[in-house]
């Protein structure tokens, strides 16, 4: 296993050195005894920028070597380790291409970090509505026709931001879209958080990096054996991206005390993927994935659901199941949790499971029987099919950001909110996609959906008054 950073950390730990440096646990010497047995092995490599351990913000040794190995594996011009998750990668890539007042094209069902980056940049977003799959009732990809319409209307846009795959593992062929954007000289920035394993090839979807995207950010911690917050940012060889600006923003936005355990896990995750490829382990892993899927397929009161659109490729690591007995996804998720099966997310209709890329996890027949019995005896609750994701394929906010920020705000009841201008992001989490964004006009349908989600006890990020059925709205000039 060629893991230069991890190896250097282990070598340092074996020296049994005397720590007179941060962090304050001093190699685990200062720690609660009750927790020490759990944390102890990790604390020995939770160090700082010591001799031989390099510096993430100016790599010249083992971190540089580890990043270069990741770049070689993924075929990028350069790869960066991220210790603040794909969130920091999304922030850096968008800030690197935008200035205040610039136009940027953004897929509407992106993660909240994308919209936060746009807001911080001062750019004016143009939102691109995705298709909604008729079988799963979730947003998928932005169709080529919508992309072309946006490019023709905004040929001077500074970037096109896409999410591929979606949280549900739905991936589209972006080749034509990327080619079209490049025809206008517009860089394509892709949040590929759920696709760090796509480098393994079929039957997994193709990575946006291979399809020619200019910057791709991946959450290694989502599908690879990396610690939470460990991600990669990949730069393609491109004249459309200023590499130094990307690096500068990563230096500004990432912690000045990056976690060595997280960085080491990124080194190990890359080596794990490389091992699968070099040792031809993929067929065995796929068989284990299929066995797990067959286990859930044996449920008589639930079923797997897949997109109706034949152009959508579903990641084999994602499994979406739905009750056959009229339960919402939230109720089905609770039933699974009572059987000690904890899933990634639920929505109004279904539950999403993220399957492991390897491992030995098995679910026995007794657990499946208990789940079936629970589904059968749990009273059904009405399921709601999501409406379309927007009336127009290409939209802009009613007011520029500068004008919005000049408006005062007030709280109004849900009943009064329709037609008003929303003043904060309303985000069901997970998946972290804003349902209503600050600056968007609130519709009657969105208020109704938010009411349903709250009644289902869905976790919604926003101010605490949402639970009291109040929304923060802007006071527009004509209403002040």
Swiss-Prot record:
<dbReference type="InterPro" id="IPR015421">
    <property type="entry name" value="PyrdxlP-dep_Trfase_major"/>
</dbReference>
<protein>
    <recommendedName>
        <fullName>Uncharacterized protein YaaO</fullName>
    </recommendedName>
</protein>
<dbReference type="InterPro" id="IPR036633">
    <property type="entry name" value="Prn/Lys/Arg_de-COase_C_sf"/>
</dbReference>
<dbReference type="Pfam" id="PF03711">
    <property type="entry name" value="OKR_DC_1_C"/>
</dbReference>
<dbReference type="InterPro" id="IPR052357">
    <property type="entry name" value="Orn_Lys_Arg_decarboxylase-I"/>
</dbReference>
<dbReference type="InterPro" id="IPR008286">
    <property type="entry name" value="Prn/Lys/Arg_de-COase_C"/>
</dbReference>
<dbReference type="Pfam" id="PF01276">
    <property type="entry name" value="OKR_DC_1"/>
</dbReference>
<dbReference type="InterPro" id="IPR015424">
    <property type="entry name" value="PyrdxlP-dep_Trfase"/>
</dbReference>
<keyword id="KW-0210">Decarboxylase</keyword>
<keyword id="KW-0456">Lyase</keyword>
<dbReference type="InterPro" id="IPR000310">
    <property type="entry name" value="Orn/Lys/Arg_deCO2ase_major_dom"/>
</dbReference>
<dbReference type="GO" id="GO:0016831">
    <property type="term" value="F:carboxy-lyase activity"/>
</dbReference>
<keyword id="KW-0663">Pyridoxal phosphate</keyword>
<feature type="modified residue" description="N6-(pyridoxal phosphate)lysine">
    <location>
        <position position="222"/>
    </location>
</feature>
<comment type="similarity">
    <text>Belongs to the Orn/Lys/Arg decarboxylase class-I family.</text>
</comment>
């Amino acid at each position: 296993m060629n893991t230069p950073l991890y190896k250097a950390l282990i070598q340092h730990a074996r020296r049994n050195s005397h720590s007179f440096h941060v962090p304050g646990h001093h190699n685990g010497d200062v720690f609660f005894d009750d927790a020490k047995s759990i944390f102890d092995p990790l604390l020995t490599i939770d160090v700082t920028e010591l001799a031989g351990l390099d510096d993430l913000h100016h790599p010249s040794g083992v971190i540089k070597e580890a990043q270069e190995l990741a770049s070689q594996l993924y075929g990028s011009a350069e790869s960066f380790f991220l210790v603040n998750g794909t969130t920091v990668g999304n922030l850096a890539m968008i800030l690197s291409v935008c200035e205040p007042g610039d136009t940027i094209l953004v897929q509407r069902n992106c993660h909240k970090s994308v919209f936060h980056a746009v807001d911080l940049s001062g750019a004016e977003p143009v939102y691109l509505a995705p298709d909604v799959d008729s079988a799963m009732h979730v947003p998928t990809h932005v169709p080529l026709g919508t992309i072309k319409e946006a490019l023709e209307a905004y040929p001077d846009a500074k970037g096109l931001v896409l999410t591929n795959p979606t949280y549900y593992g739905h991936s589209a062929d972006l080749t034509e879209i990327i080619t079209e954007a490049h025809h206008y000289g517009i860089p394509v920035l892709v949040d590929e958080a759920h696709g760090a394993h796509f480098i393994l090839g079929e039957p997994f979807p193709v990575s946006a990096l291979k399809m020619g995207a200019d910057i791709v950010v991946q959450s290694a911690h989502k599908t690879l054996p990396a610690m939470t917050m460990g991600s990669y940012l990949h730069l393609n060889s491109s004249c459309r991206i200023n590499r130094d600006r990307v690096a500068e923003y990563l230096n500004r936005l990432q912690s000045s005390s990056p976690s060595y355990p997280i960085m080491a896990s990124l080194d190990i995750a890359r080596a794990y993927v490389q091992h699968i490829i070099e040792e031809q382990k993929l067929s065995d892993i796929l068989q284990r994935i299929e066995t797990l899927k067959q286990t859930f397929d044996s449920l008589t009161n639930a079923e797997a659901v897949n997109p109706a659109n034949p152009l959508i490729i579903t990641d084999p690591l994602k499994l979406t199941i739905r009750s056959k007995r009229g339960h919402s996804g939230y109720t089905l998720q609770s039933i699974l949790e009572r059987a000690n099966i904890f899933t990634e997310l639920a929505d109004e209709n279904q539950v999403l499971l993220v399957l492991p890329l390897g491992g030995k996890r098995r679910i026995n027949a007794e657990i499946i029987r208990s789940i079936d019995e629970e589904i059968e005896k749990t009273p059904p609750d009405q399921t709601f099919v999501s409406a379309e994701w927007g009336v127009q394929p290409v939209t802009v906010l009613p007011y520029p950001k500068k004008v919005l920020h000049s408006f005062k705000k007030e709280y109004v009841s849900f009943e009064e909110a329709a037609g008003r201008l929303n003043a904060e992001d309303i985000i069901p989490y997970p998946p972290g996609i804003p349902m209503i964004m600050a600056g968007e006009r609130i519709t009657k349908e969105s208020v109704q959906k938010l009411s349903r989600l709250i009644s289902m006890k869905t976790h919604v990020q926003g101010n605490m008054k949402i639970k009291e059925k109040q929304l923060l709205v802007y006071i527009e000039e004509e209403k002040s």
